[in-house]
Amino acid sequence: MFSKQVTDSPIYKWFDNRLEIQAISDDITSKYVPPHVNIFYCLGGITLVCFIIQFATGFAMTFYYKPTVTDAFASVQYIMNEVNFGWLIRSIHRWSASMMVLMMILHVFRVYLTGGFKKPRELTWMTGVILAVITVSFGVTGYSLPWDQVGYWAVKIVSGVPAAIPVVGDQMVELLRGGQSVGQATLTRFYSLHTFVFPWLIAVFMLMHFLMIRKQGISGPL
C-alpha cells in the first residue's frame, strides 16, 4: 500500500511504532475477494459515496438555509441564484439523493437475489434494512425543506398517514407535526431529523454494517 520510500522515512516509522500502520495496511489490502464478485457487488459502496456527497453538499447549504416557514423558500432561492456555485451544490445534492435511493434499492435486490442475507449474515441484512428505512426517511424529510407548494403538501400528506393507526395514530400525527396542523414546528422537526438525527443514525448503522461485512467477508455464489 505504501512505497518503500514512505515506509523507510522516519516519520512513517515513528507512527508505525505507535499505531501499527503497516499491520492495518496489510489487513486492508490482503482481504480475500471471491472470484464470483462483479460490478453489482459495488452497489453498496456506490450508495456510501452518494451519502458522502449528500453530507458534504448538505453541510454547505446549512450556511445559507433558514428553517422557518417565512424564509425557507427564499433562502433556497438565494442559494440557487446568489451564492457562488450554490445552484451546482444544490443540484448535486438533489441528484445524488435520487442516486442514493436508486443504488440502495438495487443493492437490496442484489443481496436478496444472491442470498447474501442467509446465515451467518442475518444481522448484516437487518442493519441494511434499517439503513434502507433511514435513507427513505432522509428523502421524505429533505423533500419538505424548500417549503414550496410541493414540499408543504407532501409533508401534510406524509405526516397524516399515521392517523390510520388505531389508538395511537392521532398522537403520532401530532408528534410529527408538532401540533394539530402543519406549520413552523413541523418544519423545525423535519429539519432537525434531516440534519442531525438521521445523519447520526445512518453513521452508526453504516459502521455496524461495514464492520460485519469486514468480519464475515463477501457471501459466496448461489
Curated annotation (Swiss-Prot):
Gene: petB
Assembly and binders: The 4 large subunits of the cytochrome b6-f complex are cytochrome b6, subunit IV (17 kDa polypeptide, PetD), cytochrome f and the Rieske protein, while the 4 small subunits are PetG, PetL, PetM and PetN. The complex functions as a dimer.
Other remarks on this protein: Heme 1 (or BH or b566) is high-potential and absorbs at about 566 nm, and heme 2 (or BL or b562) is low-potential and absorbs at about 562 nm.
Gene Ontology CC entries for this record: plasma membrane-derived thylakoid membrane
Name of the molecule in the record: Cytochrome b6
Subcellular location: Cellular thylakoid membrane
Binding site for heme b 1: 107, 209
Keywords: Electron transport, Heme, Iron, Membrane, Metal-binding, Photosynthesis, Thylakoid, Transmembrane, Transmembrane helix, Transport
UniProt-listed PANTHER family: CYTOCHROME B (PTHR19271:SF16)
